Amino acid sequence: KHHDGFSLWPSKYSTHTVRESKWLNGKGDVVKMLSEACKKAGIEMGVYISPWDRNHPDYGTPKYNEVYIQTMKELLTGYGKFFELWWDGANGEGPNGKTQVYDFKRFQDSALAYQPHLMIFSDIGPHIRWIGNEQGIINETNWNLLDTAGFKRGAGGPPTDSLNRGNYNGKAWIPGEADVSIRKGWFYHEEEDKTVKSGKQLFDLYLKNVGRGGNFLLNVPPNRQGLFAPADSTALMDFKKIKDAAFKNNLFKNARILRTNNSIEVHLKEAVEINAIQLMEAISMGQRVVTFEISGGNDVKKFEIFAKGTTIGHKRIITFTTQKLKYFRIKITESKATPIISEVSGYLFAN
């Protein structure tokens, strides 16, 4: 349900739903069909339920908060397991010209009572945070920590810089999720078909969100036939091909690995062409790395620095000019505690 209040399931708490449409003679239920399809494909499902409702007559009154809770209950108890509930802070006028004072505490408590393992996204989490823009780009320094005390969802949220970077000593573990649309807008319009991002552009965005320790939320709007438009589908398949090819061959797979408290050396049998290195922290032990540098060479006694970075987190993908090297050293130059690097891998991305 987006801000217009139109429910893609036949809600008992609205008269602005698929039930009132001509689609399938009012017998359709998009959420049910999606739930069944996700279950069949083994895909977990998330749900967006906008608190803002530009149609409901109770919006802007105390009654509406209860309506919203019952709306959530319908979805969260009637359509199987959801892994994520997505909230933004939109709070405009309803049909009566009034705005709503959302009772987010009740909303959150109710949602977690219906599905205790649900992850909730918003400006302040509590589980996943917005990254402060809708371009899909996370800062190169990205802490999974965030201070939320004194802030609220929407206009009273944390500063954009904090959302994009996290907080070095944040009190809560709230990783970032980067949202962006595959085309100019969030909904399908035929005249925007030429604005669809290419597979290469999507891969570049992947490097700037997942490759910076975040999560990637890509909006792909269906057309009026309920299908992804050919341009969108082609871009998605191209993105998959590029991504699969990029990570197909781990150049460090059979390397000799030498570890110290603050460094990892990778020794290969022969020099390889390389332009990307992926690092991962064991984040079950927390996010520890503050800064690092990567050096390499073809003499085990002579290393030259060719890349530097800040945070790592779940995943950090560093790209650089293609070089032919045999030896590599990843040195943690600053960390909060003993760094625990769970993976180091190397790749040659196509130009």
PLM-predicted stretches and their roles:
Residues 1-298, 306-310, 314-320, 331-343, ...:
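Mature catalytic domains of secreted/periplasmic carbohydrate-active enzymes
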